[in-house]
């Protein structure tokens, strides 16, 4: 088994440019040394509830949040820290100028993780001209568990079912 610090040298993490800080990311960055020092972080029902409550507490039904929390903690009591290391030190994790395939970026109106400014900058840098950006009203970060979840499915279905361009000039 390897330790996360073997993959992420401390000097590389601290010198990597990061995205604009949302309040949630700014708070999370304070814990970056802990995330680097451990391979896993606890996954609790309280944490799952915080995902839904931190940005805009009324975007999801309480019974949906509770059912989701129960299902997640039934799978495992911890999750890898790698995604937190990446979001605290390496955003964006891919170079948008190398993305040449059709791309859809969806952002919840109340998302406290992915800032509008960061996503729009990323979107503008995409190499593909076949791209769409959409803001989903009344949705925070966990879009599939929100009250407006049908909007998510509609946007995805529309994107994947649209006809290919006849002319590209």
Mark where each language-model region is.
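Alpha/beta-hydrolase
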Residues: 10-94, 98-101
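Active-site nucleophile loop of the alpha/beta-hydrolase fold
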Residues: 1-9
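Short beta-strand/loop motif that positions the catalytic acidic residue
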Residues: 99, 105-107, 111
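Catalytic histidine-centered segment of alpha/beta-hydrolase-like enzymes
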Residues: 133, 139-153
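Hydrophobic "lid"/C-terminal helical patch
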Residues: 156, 160
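Conserved alpha/beta-hydrolase "acid-adjacent" motif
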Residues: 112-118
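Alpha/beta-hydrolase-fold serine-hydrolase catalytic core, especially in secreted/extracellular enzymes
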Residues: 21-25, 30, 129, 147, ...
């Amino acid at each position: 088994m390897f330790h996360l610090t073997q993959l992420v040298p401390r000097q590389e993490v601290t010198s990597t440019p990061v995205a604009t800080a949302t309040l949630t990311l700014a708070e999370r960055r304070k814990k970056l040394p802990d995330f680097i020092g451990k391979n896993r972080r606890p996954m609790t029902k309280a944490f799952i509830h915080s995902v839904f409550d931190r940005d805009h507490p009324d975007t999801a039904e309480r019974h949906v949040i509770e059912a989701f929390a129960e299902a997640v903690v039934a799978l495992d009591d911890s999750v890898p820290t790698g995604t937190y290391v990446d979001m605290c030190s390496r955003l964006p994790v891919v170079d948008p100028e190398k993305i040449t395939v059709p791309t859809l970026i969806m952002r919840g109106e109340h998302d406290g993780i992915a800032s509008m400014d960061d996503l729009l900058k990323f979107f503008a840098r995409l190499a593909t001209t076949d791209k769409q950006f959409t803001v989903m009203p009344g949705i925070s970060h966990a879009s599939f568990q929100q009250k407006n979840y049908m909007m998510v499915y509609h946007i995805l279905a529309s994107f994947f079912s649209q006809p290919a361009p006849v002319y590209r000039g």
